[in-house]
Amino acid sequence: MRFGLLTIWLLFLLALPLNAKKERKPGYEPLFGKAQAAYKVTSSSLKGATFYLVSGHGGPDPGCIGKYQGHELHEDEYAYDIILRLGRELMKRGAKVHFIIQDAKDGIRNQAILKNSKRETCMGKAIPLNQVARLKQRCDAVNALYRKDKGRYKRAIFIHVDSRSRRNQTDVFFYHAPGSSKGRVLTRELQRTFQSKYRQHQPNRGFDGSVSERNLYVLRNTAPVAAFLEVGNIQNAQDQKR
């Protein structure tokens, strides 16, 4: 199962032309794993932008569980892999990126089946099993960083792989906090980007992913403008093939 195109398409929106000067600087992030830890900053297009990337679930909570060829697919493993890939691309473009959920061992993985673990932490702290405590912990982490960061463009991105859609074709769904005009703008731009890229690369597929308000704890309680994405469903056979 792989969501490579998601990373690319998100970047069409997130790579804002703040200062699109080419650069060649070395970078290093151990969370990406030994093979991917080293990277080069090749552009300053996102210089001054800060992103708080949060993968769903983790630690004692695997999230939604799918079955594929005799293996269990845990939502948290795939959401985390997507977050790492997205974060690496953002950092290559000069952005400052905070990974709120972390696994010191996994790194970016290319296997079709990602092994499951409970090692994930919230920036080094054990993740509680209690749902409210778990969500509060990650919101507190985002907000503490948000208060310290000086940049003007600061956005939080939450990624889950448990879409409520049960159709054979599961699209990406975009949510923002109730009453958040900036959140609505962010999610609508994401939606339009996906629609455009599907028309370009898969013109016969169609795209029905919607934008809506959703009264989620993490959207209500994070200080930066936030988008919550359901990028598929780990239990959906078609998504498992992706």
Language model feature labels by segment:
Residues R2-L5, W9-L11, A15-R242:
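Catalytic-site microenvironment of enzymes
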